[in-house]
A protein has these predicted regions:
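Bacterial N-terminal signal peptides
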Residues: 13-27
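N-terminal secretory signal peptides that target proteins for export/translocation
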Residues: 1-12
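Boundary at the C-terminal end of the N-terminal hydrophobic targeting segment
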Residues: 28-32
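Extracytoplasmic/secretory-pathway proteins
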Residues: 37-228
Length: 228
C-alpha cells in the first residue's frame, strides 16, 4: 500500500506538472496583441483590431485604421474563405470617411488590391462568364473579369488622382517603410504609381500609359527613384 501511495503521489505530481506546462504554452501562444498579432488565433486578432480601429477613428489616425483593417481581413479569411467580400465592403466604408488625399489614395489602393485578390481566388468560377449590359450585380461573386477590371481601374485612377507628396514614412504603421523603401518610394504618390506600373493589379493599359507619362513629366531626368 505504501508503494502504491508513493506511485500515486508521483504520478499525480507528474499530471499537475504536465497540465501546468500545457496551460503555460497555451498562454504564451495566445498572447496575440494588435502590435504583434498571432494569426494562429484569428478571433483574438479581430478583437484587438476592432478595438484599435475604433480608437484610430476617434483619433483620426488613418494609418492605424488601415493596419487594423488589413489585420482583420487576413484573420477573417482564415476563419471563412468567403469573408473577403465583407472585408472589401468594410475597407470602402471606412475609406469613404477619410478626408486627406494621402489617406484616400492608400485606402483606394488597398481596396483595389482586395478586389484583385478576390478575382484571382475565384477566377475559375467566372471563367467564360460575361455580364449583360447594365449595372453590375450587387454581389461581386456574380461579376465577370471585365467588371473587376473596371472597378480596380477606377480605384487605382482615383488613388493616383489624389496621391500627394506625403512622406510614405507617415504610413509606416501599415506599410513597411525601411531605408530601401524610403529611398525608392519617398512619397505616397511614388508608392501608388509603382503599384500601378508594376502590373500585378488588373487595370486598363490606358491608365498605365497615363501614370507613366505623368511620372516621367514630374522627373525630367528620366525616371523616378523607384524606376531606376
Amino acid at each position: 500500500m505504501k508503494i502504491q501511495r508513493t506511485f500515486d503521489n508521483g504520478f499525480g505530481r507528474f499530471l499537475i506538472t504536465l497540465i501546468s506546462m500545457v496551460f503555460t504554452v497555451m498562454s504564451i501562444s495566445a498572447s496575440s496583441t494588435f502590435e504583434k498579432p498571432d494569426f494562429a488565433y484569428p478571433r483574438d486578432v479581430i478583437r484587438d483590431a476592432d478595438a484599435a480601429l475604433a480608437q484610430a477613428v476617434k483619433a483620426g489616425d488613418a494609418p492605424v485604421q488601415l493596419l487594423a483593417l488589413m489585420q482583420k481581413t487576413k484573420a477573417a479569411e482564415s476563419i471563412d474563405a468567403d469573408s473577403l467580400k465583407t472585408s472589401i465592403a468594410e475597407v470602402l466604408r471606412y475609406g469613404a470617411r477619410l478626408k486627406t488625399p494621402d489617406a484616400k489614395a492608400m485606402f483606394n489602393l488597398y481596396a483595389a488590391e482586395l478586389y484583385n485578390k478576390y478575382r484571382m481566388d475565384y477566377r475559375w468560377n467566372m471563367s467564360g462568364r460575361t455580364l449583360p449590359e447594365g449595372p453590375r450585380p450587387a454581389d461581386i461573386a456574380e461579376w465577370d473579369r471585365d467588371a473587376f477590371t473596371q472597378v480596380v481601374d477606377s480605384l487605382l485612377a482615383e488613388a493616383w488622382e489624389v496621391a500627394d507628396d506625403t512622406s510614405l514614412e507617415q504610413w509606416s504603421k501599415a506599410v513597411k517603410a525601411d531605408r530601401l523603401t524610403r529611398t525608392y518610394y519617398p512619397a505616397v504618390c511614388d508608392f501608388v504609381a509603382s503599384k500601378i506600373l508594376e502590373g500585378d493589379l488588373i487595370h486598363s493599359p490606358s491608365l498605365t500609359t497615363k501614370v507613366r507619362e505623368q511620372v516621367l513629366a514630374k522627373h525630367p531626368e528620366g525616371s523616378a527613384p523607384w524606376m531606376t
